[in-house]
């Protein structure tokens, strides 16, 4: 799938923040099946191709690194913001409660200033993937593949 239209690497966010100063923490649920972790890591690598800042992975359950270790993995990268990006389709207890709690941010505001490695860093919890044309196109592709 061509993601070139999503390239934000050299762009600034609508708040004027340089994206190279923003880390992305890709969050997977975690699983005892190794494929789950491989999938999350592969998607994080793809995201990294479209983002100039560092991209890391972490897992809510069963896999390492856990979310706290994932946050700490940005030490030395000079990021001043970390966006936690849950690879979940829709909101549920994990995105509303568990992930914000593990991140140490207010579940309502979904963001907070944390002292992670002796420096204050803003941590922002992104929304789940939700409804999007890209996901609909991927679903259609998977349906077509099932017919082969």
Q: What positions do the PLM features span?
A:
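Active-site-proximal alpha-helix that buttresses catalytic centers in soluble enzyme cores
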Residues: 2-148
């Amino acid at each position: 799938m061509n993601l070139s239209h999503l390239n934000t690497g050299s762009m600034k966010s609508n708040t004027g923040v340089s994206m190279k100063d923003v880390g992305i923490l890709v969050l997977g649920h975690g699983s005892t099946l190794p494929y789950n972790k491989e999938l999350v890591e592969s998607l994080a690598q793809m995201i990294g191709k479209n983002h100039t800042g560092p991209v890391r992975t972490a897992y809510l359950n069963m896999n390492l690194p856990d979310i706290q270790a994932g946050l700490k993995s940005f030490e030395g990268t000079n990021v001043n913001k970390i966006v936690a990006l849950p690879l979940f389709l829709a909101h549920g207890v994990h995105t509303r409660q568990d992930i914000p709690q593990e991140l140490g941010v207010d579940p309502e505001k979904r963001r907070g200033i944390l002292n992670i490695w002796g420096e204050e860093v803003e941590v922002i919890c992104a929304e789940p993937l939700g409804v999007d044309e890209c996901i609909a196109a991927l679903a259609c592709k998977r349906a077509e593949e099932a017919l082969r």
